[in-house]
């Protein structure tokens, strides 16, 4: 009966045998097309300019297509010139005009070259899919130019006439821009962001803006992303963490200019409370140098003020949730105010800062009324920010803690493990959970923070978002503790150490990795774990490819401060119909440099995994869905033919 009801619904879309049969033929043809190109990025950390460029060049995929089309028929500088036009069409056009090169001959040559590139990048898709990607204003013209027309005898004259008309009527600039954007879109079929869009970079909000308009993507949440999700949900400790790190990295512009969140409540409080305090331990890590000025002095006071608020809020939260197993992060009550020391793990350390006017050491985690007012006002700004709302909605709609896609397991951090290679049981919700079950339950509660109608469930969900940010058992964080307190207040650097989860030592063990695959229902020789979070030390010879190619770590350091540590500016992964290509990127110089020189950011192919045969749509997850659709349509035709359902022929 259920099957009949389903077929009745399907019959509204395909009311006749002919319409169902036509769709089966269309779907069957799609199965035999080459699979679309998947693009994997991780740990963007707000570095918008580098991120935007990698999106535009498809991690070298655009240049690869130009090479495929033109081979040795163009010089390298000509190919680079064409590539930079495709990446930045409006800016490159203006540059060419300023040079006096934009005559009809240049336009004609450029348009032909763009058409040639567009023909090859569109060849792996159905006409319908390409048509939908085309700009509406030039859809017909582009389709004419990139489609083979066997009925046209003098093809050169036919295409010449179209190109000449585009130039003569003054539409060449707009056409070049639209063609370039179409090429960018068709080069990458689907984008995977494996966590940490947010962090210290100056452009997290711009990254989110660009993802809002991206044609096809999924996101695996990183610990920095869930921190922002928690802040929007109204979790006070998450808000304090974001404000603190924004001050630490001289990055208030994202909050104030990007999201319109006013820091004035914190400014007034810090100026009054820490007026005579130099706040020397709360320096600002600016990219523009460490010059001490009035603005920096104020930022340091704000930095200390919000840090103390954060430690109080986190202490309250940890006490409320003993199941988080984070009591070693409650350190305010371990301070001996008279001696100016703090005791951690039984050892006493001198404090680098001893001035705490807002801490009552008889009740150290209680906020003063002024601190309560500051965090309440900040919270009001976060939860009522419409732009942040749209960005967090995107994270909720397109995001998850993990994803299985085309035999690849994608997650940001780790699978919590024991020393013996078994999955670590974690009890957060009254039962022991590990591996996939832990991920699934954590995601359910994270979503409850936004969608539950039960206020207690929403509160628990909000708190789980904070736990995911820095919890010792958080699969997103993957370290035994976050030593924020120690880094501010203790000189002994041995206390700053954060021990990585055992997973990061065991992901070279094939038996362990195969066990992870089995838990997530992944089979076959071409299975991979793809994750980020832990920067790969490229210059020290560390490889991002682990476990004989089964594990690929693609955090190579998009974030500028990590460039010295990793030696590069990030890894990106391409998975096309020929296999996997892992690329290491040199730091992105600037848009202006790319336009003027034509030179792209330097990329080095680190590893490849070539498929024994070309991978078709039929070999992918989408292919499985298409086969299911074909089966349903065949059942519908059968129901029409045996009289179970009646065709709805239109007169």
What are these regions (language model features)?
Residues 1-651:
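Feature recognizes metal-dependent phosphohydrolase scaffolds
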